[in-house]
From Swiss-Prot:
Molecular-function GO term, any one: NADH:ubiquinone reductase (non-electrogenic) activity
Gene: nuoI2
UniProt remark on cofactor binding: Binds 2 [4Fe-4S] clusters per subunit.
Task of the protein: NDH-1 shuttles electrons from NADH, via FMN and iron-sulfur (Fe-S) centers, to quinones in the respiratory chain. The immediate electron acceptor for the enzyme in this species is believed to be ubiquinone. Couples the redox reaction to proton translocation (for every two electrons transferred, four hydrogen ions are translocated across the cytoplasmic membrane), and thus conserves the redox energy in a proton gradient.
Protein name per Swiss-Prot or TrEMBL: NADH-quinone oxidoreductase subunit I 2
Residues the record lists as binding [4Fe-4S] cluster 1: 51, 54, 57, 110
Basic and acidic residues biased stretches: 156-169
Keyword Magnesium: no
């Protein structure tokens, strides 16, 4: 059956007439800030202490908007006769948010939890060069990162944690033998007499 000419127009007018009498729901932004979900993708924050300069984030970034510079530093041996170690030291960590497409791959591949999503999204600039945030600016965004959500009280404990807890309880039980004394009724105390019952 062919559609009746003008039926689309009638449907559109019907929707308009139905919603015309309802109360408006205009958000008064920026006076009223929106309620953002905890995992909102805003700006990326850097927790510099966790960064080991492994370069995974820069290599996996599809936009190549992460710039990292580092140098190697020799750390003396911790014990006499030990070997000196070399480690990477972070010189520059920058993200160009003019290029970033907010895919989150850099955050997912970071094995040391050095990058986090912040819900902040109001960082517009008048000059495009100011959208390249250096490590000091990225560190400032860490203050806006929300705490991780609480665990569900009804959730099962992870297998590894349950096994570790069971082993710790077993070890504590072995290290704490029952000692007879006046605190335990019916058992002999230090004088050899039976305790009160």
């Amino acid at each position: 059956m062919a559609p009746v000419p003008g039926s689309g127009l009638a449907k559109g007018l019907a929707v308009t007439l139905r919603t015309m009498t309802r109360k408006t729901v205009t958000e008064q932004y920026p006076d009223a800030q929106p309620e953002l979900p905890p995992r909102t993708r805003g700006v990326i924050g850097l927790f510099e202490e966790n960064c080991t300069v492994c370069m995974l984030c820069a290599r996996e970034c599809p936009d190549w908007c992460i710039y990292i510079d580092s140098h190697k530093e020799t750390v003396p041996a911790a014990t006499p006769g030990g070997r000196d170690r070399s480690r990477n030291v972070l010189d520059r960590f920058a993200i160009d948010f003019a290029l970033c497409m907010y895919c989150g791959i850099c955050i997912e591949v970071c094995p040391f939890d050095a990058l986090f999503w912040s819900p902040e999204f109001e960082y517009a600039e008048t000059d495009i060069r100011d959208l390249t945030h250096e490590r000091d600016k990225l560190r400032e965004w860490m203050w806006t990162v929300p705490a991780p959500p609480a665990l569900d009280p009804g959730a099962e404990e992870p297998k590894e944690l349950a096994a570790a807890r069971k082993a710790a309880d077993k070890l504590a039980a072995q290290q704490q033998p029952d000692q007879p004394g006046p605190d335990h009724p019916g058992q002999p105390d230090e004088s050899g007499q039976e305790g009160r019952t």
